């Protein structure tokens, strides 16, 4: 199986002026405000193939329905886009996800269109709700990935050590600002010894991600974001540009409690 490079960019918040890291809700991660019941997200890719940009599509490339509980966490996600005509591709595509949450555990189970389990993810949380360990099991690929997180609250850093079933290891180090936003990510491969990618993040006046700069060994990519908002301050349109070229537009239809 092709090695999966996992890049975790979970955004984390700070409580008051204390240098303590606090996990964000799924609403926060999606630039949503208020009590959101569900969000239908239509994604249009204008993207690139081998870094060659193609024309704008008039039909959504992907559509997902996300259901939230009253605390702002996912309970369910459903892909509404018709299954791929390629049977092998369709078999590997997630159609539904169910998420259950307790005080110390989050469990996610993903299914394909046949109702087969594609993967299960179980996160163990500390009393503050921070993820300590996460185990992902991919049924079809016979792959298991274990992630262990440690937190340096004084320096606002999170280190994630990742181990694959075949023994391969990776490491992610995330640095935050005083608002709790990730401002730098360092991603290591080759058993955590080789720096594969460095990312930096800047935010707009609403504290939404405005620019991400990714630096690899031989090239770099700058991604910028533009938003449109509703009366609640939720992002109803998110436009993503890669090196100045529009690559993705996400349009949201949001229903509130």
Predicted regions and their residues:
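C-terminal motif of bacterial Sec signal peptides marking the signal peptidase cleavage site
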Residues: 14-16
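Buried hydrophobic residues that stabilize the cores of well-folded domains
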Residues: 18-257
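Sec-dependent N-terminal signal peptides
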Residues: 6-9
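Positively charged n-region of N-terminal signal peptides that target proteins for export
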Residues: 1-4, 18
């Amino acid at each position: 199986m092709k090695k999966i490079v996992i890049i975790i960019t979970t955004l984390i918040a700070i409580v008051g002026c204390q240098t303590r890291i606090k996990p964000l809700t799924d609403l926060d991660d999606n630039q949503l405000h208020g009590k959101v019941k569900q969000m239908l997200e239509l994604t249009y890719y204008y993207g690139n193939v081998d870094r060659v940009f193609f024309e704008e599509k008039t039909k959504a490339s992907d559509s997902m329905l996300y259901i939230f509980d009253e605390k702002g966490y996912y309970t369910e996600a459903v892909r509404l886009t018709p299954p791929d005509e390629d049977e092998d591709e369709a078999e590997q595509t997630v159609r539904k996800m169910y998420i259950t949450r307790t005080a110390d555990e989050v469990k996610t189970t993903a299914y394909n269109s046949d109702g087969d389990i594609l993967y299960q993810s179980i996160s163990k949380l500390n009393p503050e709700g921070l993820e300590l360990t996460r185990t992902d099991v991919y049924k079809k690929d016979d792959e298991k990935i274990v992630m262990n997180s440690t937190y340096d609250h004084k320096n606002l850093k999170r280190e994630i050590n990742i181990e694959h079933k075949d023994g391969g290891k990776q490491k992610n180090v995330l640095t935050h600002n005083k608002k709790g936003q990730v401002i730098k990510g360092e991603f290591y491969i080759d058993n955590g010894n080789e720096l594969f990618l460095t990312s930096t993040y800047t935010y707009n006046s609403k504290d939404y991600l405005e620019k991400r700069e990714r630096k690899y060994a031989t090239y770099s990519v700058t991604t910028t974001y533009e938003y449109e908002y509703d009366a609640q301050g939720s992002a109803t349109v998110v436009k993503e540009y890669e090196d100045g070229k529009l690559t993705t537009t996400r349009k949201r239809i949001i229903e509130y409690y």
